[in-house]
């Protein structure tokens, strides 16, 4: 039994509240336990310069944390004048993951920005961001279709993400902050709804992990992501 009385392979309570804000084409408040992230999808006509004239669109992401999302206040990155390496890494991960959902050649010369703002952090902010932003992206695509801006549906399928870790020889799913900060090893795994891997980020924090442990972590992540996809589908009314 874990710190919060979950089973080893049990997700935290996961919820999605769609249409959380009124201006964005898609907006979702996603909660993984006490981690809460507001994910908004904004559509803008046009694409980055390096894509102009190629007849395709673009999906990108930005990520940030509110100053008091954590136990002590952090200065806003805008006030510091630059983004941290962590922020840049996470928003690139989110963008890569969400581009796997869309056939960019069917998006037209439109850009969809996914903004993921962490309201409260208790571990797994990047995985919650990906999982919530996937729903916001689908809602934004629906708006484009309703406005007759697309000739064909560009959606390929859902993606979701979850963390796994090894602590005292046991594999744990969906780590909260206390678990994440004390694990021997942790992975962040992103997959499609078909069970294909998009990204695997893994680090041995305290001691190296074996191939057998890696296989166990990936198997547990696969199960967790399948459960997350079902929750996404329920939230979407599919």
Curated annotation (Swiss-Prot):
Catalytic reaction annotation: tRNA(n+1) + phosphate = tRNA(n) + a ribonucleoside 5'-diphosphate
Self-association and partners: Homohexameric ring arranged as a trimer of dimers.
Function recorded in the entry: Phosphorolytic 3'-5' exoribonuclease that plays an important role in tRNA 3'-end maturation. Removes nucleotide residues following the 3'-CCA terminus of tRNAs; can also add nucleotides to the ends of RNA molecules by using nucleoside diphosphates as substrates, but this may not be physiologically important. Probably plays a role in initiation of 16S rRNA degradation (leading to ribosome degradation) during starvation.
Residues holding phosphate: 86, 124-126
Superkingdom of origin organism: Bacteria
Gene: rph
Alphabetically ordered keywords of this record: Nucleotidyltransferase, RNA-binding, rRNA processing, Transferase, tRNA processing, tRNA-binding
Family: Belongs to the RNase PH family.
BP terms from Gene Ontology: rRNA catabolic process; rRNA processing; tRNA processing
Protein EC: 2.7.7.56
Name this protein carries in UniProt: Ribonuclease PH
């Amino acid at each position: 039994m874990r710190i919060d009385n979950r089973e080893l392979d049990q997700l935290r309570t996961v919820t999605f509240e769609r249409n959380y804000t009124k201006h964005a084409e898609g907006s979702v408040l996603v909660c993984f336990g006490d981690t809460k992230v507001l994910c908004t999808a904004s559509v803008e006509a046009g694409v980055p310069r390096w894509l102009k004239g190629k007849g395709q669109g673009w999906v990108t992401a930005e990520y940030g944390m509110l100053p008091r999302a954590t136990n002590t206040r952090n200065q806003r990155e805008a006030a510091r004048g630059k983004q941290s390496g962590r922020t840049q890494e996470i928003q690139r991960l989110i963008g890569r993951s969400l581009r796997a959902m869309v056939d960019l050649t069917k998006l037209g010369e439109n850009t969809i920005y996914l903004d993921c703002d962490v309201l409260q952090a208790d571990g797994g902010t990047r995985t919650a961001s990906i999982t919530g932003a996937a729903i916001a992206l689908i809602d934004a695509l629906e708006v484009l279709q309703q406005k007759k801006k697309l000739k064909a549906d560009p959606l390929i399928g859902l993606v979701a993400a979850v963390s796994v870790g090894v602590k005292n020889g046991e594999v744990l799913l969906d780590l909260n902050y206390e678990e994440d900060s004390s694990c021997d090893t942790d992975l962040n795994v992103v997959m499609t709804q078909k069970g294909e891997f998009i990204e695997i980020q893994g680090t041995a924090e305290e001691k190296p992990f074996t191939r057998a442990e890696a296989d166990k972590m990936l198997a547990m992540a696969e199960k967790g992501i399948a459960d997350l996809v079902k929750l996404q589908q329920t939230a979407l009314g599919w």
